[in-house]
Swiss-Prot record:
Name listed for the protein in its UniProt record: 3-octaprenyl-4-hydroxybenzoate carboxy-lyase
Top-level class of the enzyme under EC nomenclature: lyase
Cystine crosslinks: none
Family stated for the protein in its record: Belongs to the UbiD family.
Chief localisation class: membrane
Location in or out of the cell: Cell membrane
């Protein structure tokens, strides 16, 4: 089995174990706070995925830290290392704006991309592993799942890696999104989705088209990594997450129709929650510690009523925690950063690199380096970053530098900011823009400002002064000193 060929989560865990990337924990550990503490220490040390085989009080093992290193994210996307994710980004850029071949040679060059597209359709099964065991009606009991409580002041146990499947009333394509869900009863969860996310948009369209009718929802836990990662990757609106997962995996995504609704879920998922949202049924959600490192405020969200739980034999519960970076979302951000670069470069070829520092909570600050070509060019690029991909709608700070700056080296970036910027001239402030609901620093929930920093060398028209020339060493002198460096024995 190689990184390109795994069928489901269990195959992937076997692959990880073969490579020393999975640790089985047999000691009893409590899902209440203790698993978070162990997973956090392991992630910060760059350690393996963790399978807790004996969570206290539960018969089901807990998988944590699955995507705790960029390497494992790359493996989940069918690649051997993080650098190869640039190829995934190039494929997405091609699918976002496909160009017809310009001739036979161009057709030959594009054949690998066209071949991958053949794996896009889903494969529908009549029966599936995820429906080997079925609970319905009074037998539904979410408290039997080892749902983690991650932080001391969290309101209740929280489902974190649930892949929520919805479909709007006028859409053929389903939406897959990852939204956290607070456990509030044997068959009740709070579905925390923000208003602009796909699931929430499907729900709003349903309310308008079918007022008063229950909205079908299904949630997959323990799907294969390609399907999970497909839900957090900027796939084109014309491409389903299942289709993209098939591209990553190299095989068609297998799905099965739910028992209680027409939604299709990953056939090999460990656990499926089926149910509905009753229009008007809301509940206060939170507080929860989140990826910012703070507890968020309480707010009302729809209640998800679970009517069926289906699962595999010997099911595994997949979970994570979110907290101040580094955490699993931050690691995902580092890896997916490589996917974003080719997509941005296709739209803005002048971009050399793009970096989302993990300490910036994965997406709140971006550094862009570019080949500047005219006055005002940096401002065009920063506006493009905010508007081109919806993933950057919440990016509060965009720093634009020249291509002689390493976007991933704060020493370089800070040098550019402090030597190439005038605060009044080179700072762009945009007010009343969409902001993450969890960003309590914004004056209004969901609405705040953005700042762009033009840390590029200034061109005529941007300054009237003679611009500084960077110091460059004499290469001949450098070569002469290289030749005698060991002889000098300065550090011996």
């Amino acid at each position: 089995m190689d990184a390109m060929k795994y069928h489901d989560l269990r195959d992937f865990l076997t692959l990880l174990e073969q490579q020393g990337e999975l640790k089985r924990i047999t000691l009893p550990v409590d899902p209440h706070l203790e698993i978070t503490e162990i997973a956090d220490r392991t992630l910060r040390a760059g350690g393996p995925a963790l399978l807790f085989e004996n969570p206290k009080g539960y018969a089901m093992p807990v998988l944590c830290n699955l995507f705790g290193t960029p390497k494992r994210v790359a493996m989940g996307m069918g690649q051997d290392d993080v650098s190869a994710l640039r190829e995934v980004g190039k494929l997405l850029a091609f699918l976002k704006e496909p160009e017809p071949p310009k001739g036979f040679r161009d057709l030959f060059d594009k054949l690998p991309q066209f071949k991958q597209v053949l794996n896009m359709p889903t494969k529908r099964l009549r029966g599936a592993p995820c429906q080997q065991k079925i609970a319905s009606g009074d037998d539904v009991d979410l408290t039997r799942l080892p749902v983690m409580t991650c932080w001391p002041d969290d309101a209740a146990p929280l489902i974190t890696w649930g892949l929520t499947v919805t479909r709007g009333p006028h859409k053929e394509r389903q939406n897959l999104g990852i939204y956290r869900q607070q456990l509030i009863g044997k068959n009740k969860l709070i579905m925390r989705w923000l208003s602009h996310r796909g699931g929430a948009l499907d729900f709003q369209e349903w309310l308008a088209a079918r007022p008063g009718e229950r909205f079908p929802v299904s949630v997959a836990l323990g799907a294969d990594p390609a399907t999970i990662l497909g839900a957090v990757t900027p796939v084109p609106d014309t491409l389903s997450e299942y289709a993209f997962a098939g591209l990553l995996r190299g095989t068609k995504t297998e799905v099965v129709k739910c028992l209680s609704n027409d939604l299709e879920v990953p056939a090999s998922a460990e656990i499926i929650l089926e149910g509905y949202i009753e229009p008007g049924e809301m509940a206060p959600e939170g507080p929860y510690g989140d990826h910012t490192g703070y507890y968020n405020e309480v707010d009302n969200f729809p209640v998800f009523t679970v009517t069926h739980i289906t699962q595999r034999e010997d099911a595994i519960y997949h979970s994570t925690y979110t907290g101040r970076p580094p955490d699993e979302p931050a690691v995902l951000g580092v890896a997916l950063n490589e996917v974003f670069v080719p997509i941005l470069q296709k739209q803005f070829p002048e971009i050399v690199d793009f970096y989302l520092p993990p300490e910036g909570c994965s997406y709140r600050l971006a550094v862009v380096t570019m080949k500047k070509q005219y006055a005002g060019h940096a401002k065009r690029v920063m506006m493009g970053v905010w508007s081109f991909l919806r993933q950057f709608m919440y990016t509060k700070f965009v720093i634009v530098c020249d291509d002689d700056v390493n976007a991933r080296d704060w020493n370089d970036v800070i040098w550019a900011i402090t030597t190439r910027m005038d605060p009044a001239r080179d700072t762009v402030l945009v007010e009343n823009t969409p902001i993450d609901y969890l960003d309590f620093a914004s004056p209004v929930s969901g609405l705040g400002s953005k700042m762009g920093l033009d840390a590029t060398n200034k061109w005529p028209g941007e300054t009237q002064r003679e611009w500084g020339r960077p110091i460059v060493k004499d290469p001949e002198v450098t070569a002469r000193i290289d030749a005698i460096w060991d002889e000098l024995a300065i550090f011996k």
